Amino acid sequence: MKRTSIILVLACTIALIASCKEERELVETMYSGFMTGQTDSQGYISVLKDDFGKLYKVSEETDKFRPDTLYRLVVSVALDEDNNARVIQAVPTISYIAPHDSIIPDTMRVKDPIKIESIYIGGGYLNINVGIKVKNEDSQHSLFYTCLDNTDRLQFTFYHNAYGDEYVYTKHAYVSIPLYGYGLAKNDTVFLSCKGYEEDYDYKLIYK
């Protein structure tokens, strides 16, 4: 009888441990948005950093990118309480140091409209979700930004060439403009202007 009781206690303990383990594995927080990723020597994303500076170790192999490279990404990830990240999808953003507007040739100064879906400053970047109306998935557009250099304020502008494409549905592009190197202080203002479909955009954002 005593032996039977011990076996039952052990069985209950094992079942409880397994149940707790299973419950812990299910505790994940889904996140979709901008993050910074570092690839390893094989091109897999190894570490992600959110816009608050928190680091997450990537727990599974991802799509391959350029090895040993820092990427600004839009990701869909599952984050757990041990700071591990399981990457579901990762899309590189359009991200580069903005050239001075004065060096852009006139042939590239096309301002077809775009739609700003969302915009905010975070992680040291000006992050923008851009909507572009296209005819189909294979439509080819050009989209880039510059920094105006004939002004005493930090102002960016977009150029978009639709090459005469028809407006059928909206396709998204993600942009992260690096803000380091401009000597910005807390509460400085960052400006962005571009042509919109219904009205033009003129944003003033506070650097924090």
Regions found by a protein language model. Name each.
Residues 6-14:
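Sec-dependent N-terminal signal peptides
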Residues 15-19:
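C-terminal motif of bacterial Sec signal peptides marking the signal peptidase cleavage site
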Residues 20-24:
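Bacterial signal peptide processing site
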Residues 29-208:
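First exposed extracellular module after export/assembly in secreted or surface-exposed proteins
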Residues 1-5:
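Positively charged n-region of N-terminal signal peptides that target proteins for export
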